[in-house]
Amino acid sequence: MARPRHLRGLGMCITAVLASFIAGFTVGWFIKPLKETTTSAGYHQSIQQKLLSEMKAENIRSFLRSFTKLPHLAGTEQNLLLAKKIQTQWKKFGLDSANLVHYDVLLSYPNETNANYVSIVDEHGVEIFKTSYLEPPPDGYENVTNIIPPYNAFSASGMPEGELVYVNYARTEDFFKLEREMNINCTGKIVIARYGKIFRGNKVKNAMLAGAMGIILYSDPADYFAPDVQPYPKGWNLPGAAAQRGNVLNLNGAGDPLTPGYPAKEYTFRLPVEEAVGIPNIPVHPIGYNDAERLLRNLGGAAPPDKSWKGSLNVSYNIGPGFTGSEYSRNIRMHVNNINKITRIYNVIGTIRGSTEPDRYVILGGHRDSWVFGGIDPTTGTAVLQEIARSFGKLVNGGWRPRRTIIFASWDAEEFGLLGSTEWAEENAKLLQERSIAYINSDSAIEGNYTLRVDCTPLLNQLVYKVAREISSPDDGFESKSLYESWLEKDPSPENKECPRINKLGSGSDFEAYFQRLGIASGRARYTKNKKTDKYSSYPVYHTIYETFELVQNFYDPTFKKQLSVAQLRGALVYELADSVVIPFNIQDYAKALKNYAASIFNISKKHDQQLRNHAVSFDPLFSAVKNFSEAASDFHRRLTQVDLNNPIAVRIMNDQQMLLERAFIDPLGLPGRKFYRHIIFAPSSHNKYAGESFPGIYDAMFDIENKADPSLAWAEVKKHISIAAFTIQAAAGTLTNVL
């Protein structure tokens, strides 16, 4: 019986890979002994240099210009047309396959006939002030249609009315301050919070837990306006009428809210919308800082507790609740009329078949959808991905082929909760867990123009450093230096000043399902701002209509050299992972990281030294497991350096041990309340999805433990998660031992 079309997914994309597996594997592994000589090592390096020199800044510029002319929101016709354009180009570049893979997911849009806004109402219910509905279009885009107005996707609909309370960034600690120290109750109130510091979905969750009946989000100039820079279009700062779009889900890795854990195909069972995962039950709406100033101007109540609660608007930043003076009797009313509907989205999946190990995959993926034009997010990443695919295609057309299969992915609906990438990961989980070497993310290539930023698994640290040394720095004053040298000088690691900083992976982009759920080694790289001096959040015009091609060309990267460096780094990582005989992971770096993370979580626990003794909580099993892992890693590294490269079975065994190590840190039961976050060593912070947390089970169990109702139960939970972490690390160490 023919396989149903809708079940093909990855299989449709790599039919040639699987069909040639027996021949390729047999010929590559068993008939021809591997000849790893100086010549072949030199050949490997020469191909990498060809790849890097093939990439051109002007091509990235052209792709960015082409892809940002029109809005391409997930689920729209324009984004499908862009998917087809990318598919056509990949085929032209010489990829072996390029296919559209669709899913039917829940998306959220504003009501076209019933606008979202916030108003101030008098004692008679008359609206005396209304926030703006649209952002003024930038120069040259006045006639562009289908621009979605600012909104927060998946906000509940409704018209709550009540007193206003200012809650700073709506972080957990902000609500603790209000409730525990200032005795301010947010129950039944509408709260207003600044964007920044944490993921907006966490802000909404915190507001719900505090009992608020609605939350207004705005970008304060203190967080989104750099000193001495003009607002767009004269500079790259945020105009006062601009508002940041974004989803406010708390999916915790679930993917499509109606099909958590399973791909959203035609045959899939769906939850009723009222049972959908992660959707807030209160209205949420974003506004610009001009409108926010009007709402905050006459807030009464307590003064801000300290200067960290004050932004840069010309207001007192009083907390409320409610207004003072002539506006004493007035309230806030929210009008939110979003519509949630099941919508078809499209990923583009392309492949270059591996010559020797076609059943081993290296994935390079980035999202295509944007809120409006996507000048930075994501289309600098899309343009970079396109140039990498073109350059690999050029090598293939010249007769080269990677040792392992390379999969290119253009994801849809990332802005709606990482949906396209997660659904594809769910549909192909069994294949990916068995065969994937690594996932490299290709979201925005820039978020600033100061230096490189890398977040990755410790397995990739040394490879990142290696390829960064082989790429020229694009930075002014470093013309004869490498990317590694400029990165090291500008952002050294706080733990080791002799190496550049590499961050832990959190979430917020499409690597999430691959790393946090499936345990596939993952990494991301982009150019960023100077975090020591630039205190604004993200980049000022993030997720607004002013993210245009001109923003990038005129201000962020006029030469496109920063994006070229990112393309070369991402491309070189993919090349090394796909074509090196021995997978270029460094397991000893994982051992060092575990040692540091164990010491860090233990130091946090020392704040509760007496309680640790009272409840007989010991970290000894964790330290013992880390020690055993370190010894196993050292022994594995020794054997890896001695492996007979002419023995393909020996190489394959050790490569598989490396490939599967990240998988060994996966707990099938997941973290408490977050079952799709299954990595025991790393997870997004429970209080900020964007940030990575180490030993998240232990950390979450200890968070605010002094205020838990039952201390014995709370400390028992800490013991449990120390035990889980110790077991997992010990089991991972076991996977590194010599094969019997």
From Swiss-Prot:
EC number annotated for this UniProt entry: 3.4.17.21
Cofactor(s) the protein needs: Zn(2+)
Main enzyme class: hydrolase
Keyword Transmembrane tagged: yes
Cofactor note: Binds 2 Zn(2+) ions per subunit. Required for NAALADase activity.
Protein residues bound to Ca(2+): T259, Y262, E423, E426
GO BP term (any one): catabolic process
Pfam families, A to Z: PA, Peptidase_M28, TFR_dimer
Subcellular location: Cell membrane
Positions that bind Zn(2+) 2: D377, E415, H543
Residues that hold substrate according to the record: R200, N247, E414, S507, G508, R524, A525, R526, Y542, H543, K689, Y690
Extracellular side: 32-740
Tissue distribution: Expressed ovary, testes and lung, but not brain.
Name of the featured protein: N-acetylated-alpha-linked acidic dipeptidase 2
Lineage of origin: Eukaryota, Metazoa, Chordata, Craniata, Vertebrata
Gene: Naalad2
